[in-house]
Design a protein with these regions (language model features):
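Solvent-exposed, charged interface segments at domain starts and junctions
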Residues: 19-34, 38, 105-118, 219-222, ...
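Bacterial extracytoplasmic/cell-wall-associated proteins, especially those involved in peptidoglycan
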Residues: 165, 169, 182-373
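Signal peptide-directed extracytoplasmic domains
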Residues: 61-227
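A generic short-segment signal for beta-strand/edge and adjacent turn/coil regions
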Residues: 44-50, 91-94, 115-119, 169-175, ...
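Hydrophobic core
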Residues: 51-55, 89, 252
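N-terminal targeting leaders characterized by basic, low-complexity, disordered sequences
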Residues: 1-22
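N-terminal type II signal-anchor transmembrane helix
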Residues: 27-73
Length: 373
C-alpha cells in the first residue's frame, strides 16, 4: 500500500512547450552580389535623372529670367542713389517691369562679381534689355538723358500714372505734386488747390537723375513763357479773367473738343454764357467730378464742378491743355452761339453750333443719334 501523499496540483502541471527552432541566417534568401549591384545602380541612376532634370529646369528658368521682359522700346528712367543695394535696385527694376525676376538679378550680380560695382546715377532703360545689358550699363555709371513727354488732356491722376510709367517712384510723385512752388503762373491759384491743369504738355529733355519737382518747375516756366510771348495774359486780363480762371476755362475747352478751329468757337460759346449769366452746361465737368468722387456720371451730380447745376466756372481746371485751347480762350471765334453738340456716326469729329435752344435740339436730332440718346 502506497502511503505517500499525492502530489498537489498534479493535474495543473504545464505541458512542456516544444523547443524554439532558431532561424539560421543561412536559411534566409540572400541577394546575389550581382543583383545587389544592379539595384544600387538603378537607384543611383534614378537619383541622377532627378538631379539632372532639376538642374536642367533651373538652368532653363535662369536663362529665361535674366532675359529681356518684352520687346517694348519705351524708355524708363531709373535713379540709383548712393548707398542703394543690389537688392533694392532689383526691387525698383522689377517694379517697373524692367526685369523678370528679382532673384535672378541678384544671382546674376553675385555670379558675375558685379553686385558691389553698381554705380549711383540716373539711367534710361528699356524692357527690351536683358539683365546683362542693364548691369553693364549700371557698372559704367554713365548718366543718361531722357526725352520725357507730358501729353495734353490728362488729369492729375492720369499724369501720376504716366510719370510712374516713366520711372518716377510713387513717393517722388507724391512729393512733387504736394510741394509748394513760388511761381507767377500759380499766383492766382486758390489756397489749397492742387496742380490740376498746370503741368504743361510738352516734351522735355532732362538728365535721368533730375527730380520730378525740377521737371514740374520747368513745365511752369514753359507754360508762363507761352502765356507771355503769345500775349494770352493781356487778352485774359481784358476779359476780366485771372490766369486760374483762364486755365480752368481752357481745360474745359480742351476736354470738349480737340480741333483748334472748333476750340475757338466753343470758347466763344462759353464766354458768351458767362457774360450772359448762364450756366456753362458742360458735360465734361460733371464727368470729371464723377471720376474724382467715384460716382456715376449724371447731369444731376452734386458737385461744385458740375456746371450743369452750378453757375460760373468750376473751382479749378479739369485737365492740362494744348496751347490751342489757351489761345481759344484768349482769341475766341466771332459769333453769338450759345449751344454746341458733337456729332456721332457719319458726323463723328464734327461740332455743330446753334444760337437758340430749338436749333440746338434740331442739331441733336440730326447729328447726335447715339451719344445723345
Amino acid at each position: 500500500m502506497d502511503i505517500r501523499p499525492p502530489r498537489p496540483n498534479a493535474a495543473r502541471e504545464k505541458t512542456p512547450e516544444p523547443p524554439i527552432k532558431p532561424v539560421l541566417l543561412e536559411n534566409m534568401p540572400v541577394l546575389s552580389t550581382s543583383k545587389r549591384r544592379k539595384t544600387l545602380t538603378l537607384t543611383l541612376a534614378g537619383l541622377a535623372v532627378v538631379l539632372l532634370g532639376a538642374t536642367t529646369s533651373t538652368a532653363l528658368w535662369y536663362s529665361w529670367a535674366i532675359g529681356a521682359p518684352s520687346d517694348e522700346e519705351r524708355q524708363v528712367r531709373v535713379v540709383v542713389e548712393p548707398g542703394d543695394t543690389a537688392t533694392g535696385i532689383a526691387e525698383t527694376l522689377h517694379e517697373h517691369d524692367l526685369i523678370r525676376s528679382k532673384l535672378a538679378f541678384n544671382v546674376y550680380t553675385q555670379l558675375t562679381g558685379t553686385r558691389s560695382k553698381l554705380q549711383a546715377g540716373g539711367y534710361v532703360l528699356s524692357p527690351n534689355q536683358d539683365v546683362s545689358s542693364i548691369v553693364d550699363h549700371m557698372v559704367s555709371g554713365e548718366t543718361d538723358e531722357i526725352d520725357l513727354t507730358i501729353p495734353p488732356g490728362l488729369t492729375l491722376d492720369e499724369l501720376r500714372k504716366s510719370f510712374f510709367a516713366d520711372g518716377f517712384s510713387e513717393a517722388e510723385i507724391d512729393q512733387a505734386f504736394s510741394a509748394s512752388y513760388d511761381h507767377p503762373l500759380l499766383a492766382s491759384r486758390p489756397a489749397g488747390a492742387d496742380l490740376e491743369g498746370y503741368i504743361y504738355p510738352e516734351t522735355y529733355r532732362m538728365n535721368a537723375n533730375q527730380t520730378l519737382g525740377e521737371l514740374l518747375e520747368r513745365s511752369f516756366d514753359e507754360f508762363y513763357r507761352v502765356l507771355e510771348e503769345k500775349k494770352y495774359l493781356e487778352e485774359y486780363q481784358k476779359r476780366g479773367l485771372s490766369i486760374h480762371q483762364a486755365v480752368t476755362l481752357a481745360s474745359i475747352v480742351q476736354k470738349e473738343v480737340t480741333n483748334p478751329t472748333d476750340q475757338k468757337q466753343v470758347a466763344q460759346v462759353f464766354l458768351k454764357r458767362l457774360n450772359d449769366g448762364m450756366m456753362l452746361g458742360s458735360d465734361v465737368t460733371f464727368i470729371y467730378a464723377a471720376e474724382q468722387m467715384g460716382a456715376e456720371a449724371t447731369p444731376g451730380l452734386d458737385s461744385p464742378y458740375n456746371t450743369r447745376k452750378v453757375s460760373g466756372l468750376p473751382p479749378g481746371p479739369i485737365a492740362n491743355m494744348n496751347p490751342s485751347a489757351l489761345e481759344a480762350v484768349a482769341f475766341p471765334a466771332g459769333g453769338d452761339y450759345l449751344y454746341f453738340v458733337a456729332g456721332d456716326g457719319p458726323d463723328a469729329g464734327k461740332t455743330f453750333f446753334a444760337r437758340t435752344e430749338a436749333e440746338h435740339e434740331a442739331n441733336i436730332t440730326a447729328h447726335c443719334r447715339t451719344l445723345c440718346n
